[in-house]
A protein has these predicted regions:
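Membrane-embedded alpha-helical bundles of multi-pass enzymes
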Residues: 1-175, 206, 211
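Soluble catalytic regions of membrane-associated enzymes that act on cell-envelope
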Residues: 170-210
Length: 213
């Protein structure tokens, strides 16, 4: 699933057999590298509160989960149409990452990147998990278009989630779907103490918050 020519990665020893028939170990390496750079760019705000080293440690910890994403992604890709089961692999790893450590780190779920996007309305049917699966399925379909085989399946993997998202939008915000309205004002409180366990202090943060309905 690497849409670049061999010569582009030859200098890194990633061309040839490793690129066309990657091992689970190679997939884990790709997954970790992608995850590390992703979280290093995504989480610098954490460093503003806890310092640079805890921020880097958190990014590395989050990237460790991508080892499983890459390794199992390579394994399922060996099946016929196995790449299209990859969204379930991604979702499973995302669930574990959202549960541990420190009570989970769900702020980096893929679904949050689809807010106001064409797939966001799917959350009304299956929550952020369905949005994540649909997003990864579209991505797999786009990559699979570069392959000579299974292009019809690839097109279906792109069109079906997008079509489902458009259908879901129809039922969002309609009068028939609205029971009542409420105006809410909220002031979010801070954590009692700094540190990487801030996600475990949910109840304390709620107690320090002011919510008016």
């Amino acid at each position: 699933l690497m849409p670049w020519p061999r010569r582009a990665t030859a200098a890194l020893g990633m061309a040839g057999e490793a690129q066309e028939h990657p091992s689970a170990r190679f997939g884990a390496l790709i997954g970790f590298t992608h995850g590390l750079f992703c979280y290093l760019f995504l989480l610098p705000w954490v460093g503003e509160f806890v310092g640079a080293m805890p921020y880097i440690a958190l990014a590395i910890t989050m990237a460790l989960y991508a080892l499983a994403t890459g390794a199992f992604g390579v394994l399922v890709a060996r099946w016929r149409y196995g790449a299209f089961t990859f969204p379930l692999v991604y979702l499973a790893v995302e669930f574990v990452r959202s549960s541990w450590p420190f009570g989970g780190f769900a702020w980096v779920r893929l679904a949050w990147g689809q807010i106001n996007g064409p797939l966001a309305a799917l959350s009304a049917w299956g929550g952020p998990a369905l949005v994540t699966v649909a997003t990864v399925l579209v991505a797999v379909g786009c990559v699979s278009l570069l392959s000579a085989a299974s292009r019809r399946v690839a097109v279906a993997a792109i069109i079906l989630p997008l079509a489902a998202g458009l259908i879901a939008i129809i039922g969002v915000g309609k009068d028939s779907s609205t029971v009542d309205q409420a105006r809410v004002g909220a002031v979010q409180g801070n954590v009692p103490r700094l540190g990487l366990d801030f996600n475990e202090q949910r109840r304390a943060v709620l107690s320090l918050s002011l919510i008016h309905i």
